[in-house]
């Protein structure tokens, strides 16, 4: 296995995400394997959404040999550790993203493009809203429609 990316240094780093993962592994008496850290490091380099297949391809292209089952299992661990979130957008395979500030997903029903937007008004509404006998941890808002690119293509096709 390739080790020139200093995975051992990465695993011992003071990065808050790495620390959170280490704490999760310790709390659950799980092994801290190089493969798990390879997966975590690659995920931390990704901005936005990704599928497990895309993640596997990135790891492979980096020259690491990590089995598909290890990638899937590590993704599940990262979800349990509250580092990743899984999204299953209508009609699409599962996508993942690092947990960040609350945001809305705009999903194009024509091309499948997913765009994230931060809506401070909606966030303020959710933070101020009190639900009877319920404490909100996080929320996901998916808005389905047609992106501007697909709308232009449809308009041109009509003419």
Where are these regions (language model features)?
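N-terminal leader segment of winged-helix/HTH proteins
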Residues: 1-29
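Pre-recognition alpha-helix immediately N-terminal to the DNA-recognition helix
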Residues: 37-42
């Amino acid at each position: 296995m390739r080790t020139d990316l200093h995975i051992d240094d990465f695993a011992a780093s003071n990065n808050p995400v790495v620390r959170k993962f280490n704490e999760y592994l310790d709390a659950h008496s799980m092994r801290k394997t190089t493969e798990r850290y390879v997966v975590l490091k690659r995920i931390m380099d990704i901005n936005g959404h990704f599928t497990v297949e895309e993640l596997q391809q990135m790891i492979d292209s980096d020259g690491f040999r990590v089995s598909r089952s290890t990638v899937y299992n590590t993704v599940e661990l990262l979800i349990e550790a509250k580092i990743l979130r899984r999204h299953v957008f209508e009609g699409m395979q599962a996508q993942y993203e690092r947990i960040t500030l609350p945001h809305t997903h705009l999903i194009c029903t024509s091309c499948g493009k997913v765009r994230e937007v931060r809506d401070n008004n909606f966030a303020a509404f959710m933070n101020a809203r009190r639900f009877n006998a319920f404490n909100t941890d996080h929320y996901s808002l998916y808005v389905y429609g047609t992106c501007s690119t697909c709308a232009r293509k449809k308009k041109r096709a009509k003419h």
